[in-house]
């Protein structure tokens, strides 16, 4: 019987999660969904000083926004300390781990001497029990660390789904500290216990964990566990070619939401940031899950391209449901001081969205419908609301007022009739109308704008300009 696929995302809640971090959630999520398996969230919060619930909330919020639903968790490592201590005790009892009383000063001196001899700095196994070896009496009052009894010969081998076959000689690995003097377990130990207890079959994570992998595999083997499949993802680089990080200007995942990006655009972009399905650039979440595999993960670092993300976001805005976009855009309009009343917001979105890269862009254009009575620049009024144009404006207002139906086509036909009657070109009449109705010279198509403003508002505003 084939083992059920189980993947995990195991972030540290230290206050910031950027696109590179969340990609390490997206890929295991997609693989679990593709394989009809389980996606587990584990919060690695053993760094008590840097971890916070606020940071956990940011992680959960970002995952929820992107639709990365979890099947189990979140599990918190700090809530599993009893389990870790249980396994530590078992390892000591079975000879898989041992207490080491070497002080920090002694270890530093050892490493310095090794460096002077041109050797790789490493623990020398002084306190490691061996047949026939007589250990010194433990120093009084010194609390030991616990070290894992790493194999002395052989090698660690795994076929990484991204990097291929990797082999590390055990001679390169010293006896890893798995518990500190105060008894708290270390990162590599906790990860192994968690992955075994949670029956994780595929570990998909950043390649900064490659060096941890042989140590973790040896502990897994010692505990009699099954080694998972590893896939170590290359680094995500920022625009400057540096590793993406808060220090180098990366924005948080929820920051993209707050800037007006759609979650489907971010998911689509992240999916292609290190994985490919032929030449496909635009695909739905469902297609991504259907297509995702480990074989087509990229082997080279992926570089963040904000223009590509903006292009994708523009696409999803253009094809997006206008009612949904209206609700998502409303807060951005209100943040600009607009009051969403009068013009139908769904209709406004349909009119203005095509050239927008973000919902902020949509809101900026839509604002002309929701900022109250227009306050056009006096110089522009003087330039465009000339005495010569007044008769045409009056005629336009009269004919618009007489329309049986307030529809874009009828408004367009009325403009054409007035232009023909007075021998004018469209800009000569449209510019003053834009100023009077919208308070600005640049708007979408004038007939569509007037339709959305509504008959009463249009006639009132044109009338105010004619009377002035």
UniProtKB/Swiss-Prot annotation:
NCBIfam families: gltX_bact. ATP binds at residue 246. The lineage of its organism: Bacteria, Pseudomonadati, Pseudomonadota, Betaproteobacteria, Burkholderiales. Keywords: Aminoacyl-tRNA synthetase, ATP-binding, Cytoplasm, Ligase, Nucleotide-binding, Protein biosynthesis. Pfam families: Anticodon_2, tRNA-synt_1c. The gene is gltX. Belongs to the class-I aminoacyl-tRNA synthetase family. Glutamate--tRNA ligase type 1 subfamily. The keyword Ligase applies. It comes from Cupriavidus pinatubonensis (strain JMP 134 / LMG 1197). A motif ('KMSKS' region) lies at residues 243-247. This is Glutamate--tRNA ligase.
